[in-house]
């Protein structure tokens, strides 16, 4: 029995762009000697006593089973010849900005999901090009010619299918999913490939005998809702290629933050304050980029024993002034009870964000 009507908007033209092994690709571009070698973005475990995690890695390293969020120690054990690079996140952010400017040539309806991926609605694009596939090819060409990097593209009538399509043929692939092909495309996919279906849901689906899109398609809507609640409603529609979520070019950010984990524990106040300052500068730069001001400053401290303290202060006025944020973050740290254990993580976050007002100038 169908609980809610199925409304499927197939009139849109959506592109999902996903940069190929982005951080590692930037490093290879800037150091051609790395090409063809397994490259891991993360601290070298031989220098950190085995601590640290993999941020990302190139396709050569993935042949050894290395993946993001894996411990650096395990990555080294899988591939002792891997080249570990700590990463230059300011450089990656600059390259990401270049890529976003390329997107904007074609449409202003761009929804960045992270530094290396974004959705574009090109239904009504700036150049009046009718073919979304042609636009995707032009974007791939522009990024390669101007930035020296490859990306994969997925094209379809909604974000869900475009995202799946971009992951279908990597690296440097382009996959189109038409409305008449959607059910066949989804039927063959393992359920864990469905974007938005996490590990816990995958296990639950497997327990129900659901392993592929075809299996999911056969399950009644009410059964899915009984097992998954509101998410069951979404699953029923995703199995049918239905997802009407718009591309949101003005995604609302609830917070902007920066945190760092330290392989070598911090003990000295001067070192701690210096690291707080680095985080603050990163936050201030992000506030500037996103044209945001904030009122609440949050300091996060994690000690060697994994005790984590979070404390916040709300200011009377909006700000994005780095010196002001740093002063408050430093005061918050000074107010914490002394802990002889070294610090392994520091984070600074700005919340209660609002759009920048033209007559406020607090970033001098």
UniProtKB/Swiss-Prot annotation:
> What residues make up the catalytic site?
117
Cellular-component GO terms for this entry: cytosol
Coiled coil region boundaries: none
Q: List ligand-binding residues for Mg(2+).
A: 18, 116
Q: What class of enzyme is it?
A: transferase
| Catalytic activity reported | DNA(n) + a 2'-deoxyribonucleoside 5'-triphosphate = DNA(n+1) + diphosphate
Required co-factor(s) are:
Mg(2+)
A GO molecular-function descriptor:
damaged DNA binding
Q: Which residues form the UmuC domain?
A: 14-198
The Gene Ontology biological process terms listed for this entry are:
DNA-templated DNA replication; error-prone translesion synthesis; SOS response
Q: Give site residues, Substrate discrimination.
A: 23
**Cofactor note from UniProt?**
Binds 2 magnesium ions per subunit.
Kindly report the protein's main subcellular placement as a broad class.
cytoplasm
Fill in the subunit field for this protein. Monomer.
Which family does the record assign? Belongs to the DNA polymerase type-Y family.
Q: Which HAMAP family does the entry link to?
A: DNApol_IV
* Listed NCBIfam families: PRK02406.1 (NF002677)
Question: Which PANTHER family does the record associate with it?
Answer: DNA POLYMERASE KAPPA, DNA REPAIR POLYMERASE UMUC / TRANSFERASE FAMILY MEMBER
General function of this protein? Poorly processive, error-prone DNA polymerase involved in untargeted mutagenesis. Copies undamaged DNA at stalled replication forks, which arise in vivo from mismatched or misaligned primer ends. These misaligned primers can be extended by PolIV. Exhibits no 3'-5' exonuclease (proofreading) activity. May be involved in translesional synthesis, in conjunction with the beta clamp from PolIII.
**Name used for this protein in its record:** DNA polymerase IV
Q: Organism, per UniProt?
A: Streptococcus pyogenes serotype M1
Q: Which gene encodes it?
A: dinB
